[in-house]
Amino acid sequence: AASDVYKRQEYWCIPSREDAEFIACMEDVLDVYELPYNPQRPVVCMDEKPYQLLGEARSPLPMRPGNDQKVDSEYVRNGTCSIFAFVEPLGGAHHVSVREHRTAIDWAEEIKYLADVMYPDVEKIILVMDNLNTHKPASLYKRYTADEARRIMKRLEIHYTPKHESWLDIAEIELNVMTRQCLNRRIDNISNLRKELSAWEVERNTVAAKVNWQFRTEDARIKLNSLYPTFTTASE
């Protein structure tokens, strides 16, 4: 029977049991999101996603009066690339870029761009991101001299989301919005993808699209109460 072959699987967006490490990282990030807007200490969220470049196996039939464009279900895989995204939730600043790979070197170069181009004059950049293996200070030292890597690091205050819990990274929301608005069709090469995302970035920055994050520590302590360690107080 099919039920004997296909076993039901469960996937959790949050831990299924008490998890102090998750709680500690989550509350740290939520505290950052509650900080008031300070242009000298901007809170910036960063995330990245792979993207599959797809070409057409056959030329689409163009739109005609009364008929939509017709696209063949068959497509051609043209390799993959990586999309990096930065968003400042309270300031409304946005940046997306496309790279052929997602190595430590790529991340380091993106962080240098964040520090030297996006925010060259601020006191400190408060950076929220997931703890992917390349999202580490060591990556800067792999790309730049020790002096340069240290200079960039001193510009940053890093906060990591809990492991496997990237829903706490506002930049993931940004990538989801971008996917719905800009990537709902086949794009066959990096050059075209960069043009599409550049236009999308300009639009997002023109309207200074902000993010109103509502989930706070006090909410977490109620809704996720089962994940918090419990303590028994001895009676006197």
Predicted feature locations:
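Extended, low-complexity cationic-aromatic segments
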Residues: 26-112, 224
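RNase H-like polynucleotidyl transferase catalytic core
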Residues: 69-75, 148-170, 186-189
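C-terminal domain-tail junction helix/linker
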Residues: 57, 192-236
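Acidic/histidine-rich, metal-coordinating catalytic segments
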Residues: 122-136, 162
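Short, basic/hydrophobic alpha-helical segments
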Residues: 105-126
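Active-site proximal helix-loop segment of RNase H-like, two-metal nucleases, encompassing DDE(D)
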Residues: 94, 163, 171-190, 203-207
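Mobile genetic element proteins and their domesticated derivatives, centered on retroelements
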Residues: 45-47, 86, 111, 130, ...
